[in-house]
């Protein structure tokens, strides 16, 4: 579960390394985000000559969370770290590569471009 002030890793090659959630989108009282949800992030750490720079405010899709993800068949998956992929205003990824596995739940939330770029879908 991701809430305001949560730090996340960036799972793409946009140039950002760490981001902080500053808003969970989807309602005025919404507190938590999970896999597939869109959040607003501030870039806290970035590499030189990347597509984004420190201090930029962007949208991101949460792709991995430490909290258990329960599936309809009763199975549970869990990741070691929280991670997100930066997106633009048209909901397309800013980077051209995705690092690490992503869960199938992104397919239900219509993030097919992220699914197709990912090296592994769990």
Swiss-Prot record:
The keyword rRNA-binding applies. It comes from the Bacteria. One of its GO terms (molecular function) is structural constituent of ribosome. Transmembrane segments: none annotated. Coiled coil: none annotated. Keywords: Ribonucleoprotein, Ribosomal protein, RNA-binding, rRNA-binding. One of its GO terms (cellular component) is cytosolic large ribosomal subunit. GO terms for biological process: translation. SUPFAM superfamilies: Ribosomal protein L14. HAMAP family: Ribosomal_uL14 (MF_01367). Belongs to the universal ribosomal protein uL14 family. PANTHER family: 50S/60S RIBOSOMAL PROTEIN L14/L23, LARGE RIBOSOMAL SUBUNIT PROTEIN UL14M. Part of the 50S ribosomal subunit. Forms a cluster with proteins L3 and L19. In the 70S ribosome, L14 and L19 interact and together make contacts with the 16S rRNA in bridges B5 and B8. Binds to 23S rRNA. Forms part of two intersubunit bridges in the 70S ribosome. This is Large ribosomal subunit protein uL14. It comes from Nitrobacter winogradskyi (strain ATCC 25391 / DSM 10237 / CIP 104748 / NCIMB 11846 / Nb-255). The lineage of its organism: Bacteria, Pseudomonadati, Pseudomonadota, Alphaproteobacteria, Hyphomicrobiales. The gene is rplN.
């Amino acid at each position: 579960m991701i809430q305001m002030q949560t730090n996340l890793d960036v799972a793409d090659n946009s140039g950002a390394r760490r981001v902080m959630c500053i808003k969970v989108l989807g309602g005025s009282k919404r507190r938590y985000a999970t896999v597939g949800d869109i959040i607003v992030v501030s870039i806290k750490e970035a590499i030189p000559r990347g597509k984004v720079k420190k201090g930029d405010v962007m949208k991101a899709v949460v792709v991995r969370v430490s909290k258990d993800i329960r599936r309809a068949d009763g199975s549970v998956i869990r990741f070691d770290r929280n991670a997100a992929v930066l997106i633009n205003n048209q909901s397309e990824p800013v980077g051209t590569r995705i690092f690490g596995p992503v869960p199938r739940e992104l397919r239900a939330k219509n993030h097919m471009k992220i699914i197709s770029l990912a090296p592994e879908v769990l």
